């Protein structure tokens, strides 16, 4: 579910509002499809575009948030913030798809093509976090 648009980006939810045991797989599958589609678009263009995707997996606070006059279903919490930080790191690593250690673990053998970028300092976090790149 595309939950909201944020400037030139968007927040997509997998496993909310309905629980999905394979949410990490769904998110990575969608990301790979977007990258594939971008490759086809760029092949037919003189102005190639790049996208950056960050995927994290974990618990969130989900529900209708807002005033009584305008409520909006959304998710908040550290998981959302961390995914946003991952997305922003794509510029630093010249990458397009970064995932957290939690996503890598949830993928199991389906994440065997993940390349470790090591423990990376993340803005707003005291300890460096293990980051993985997918192609």
Regions found by a protein language model. Give the residues of each.
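Alpha-helical scaffold within the catalytic cores of cyclic-nucleotide enzymes
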Residues: 16-53, 78-89, 112-113
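Cytosolic regulatory/linker segments at or just downstream of nucleotide-handling modules
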Residues: 60-62, 83, 89-135
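Acidic/histidine metal-binding catalytic segments
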Residues: 6-7, 45-54, 96-101
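Catalytic NTP-binding/metal-coordinating core of nucleotidyl cyclase/transferase enzymes
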Residues: 1-29, 73, 91
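Active-site loop/short helix in cyclic nucleotide turnover domains
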Residues: 14-18, 59-67
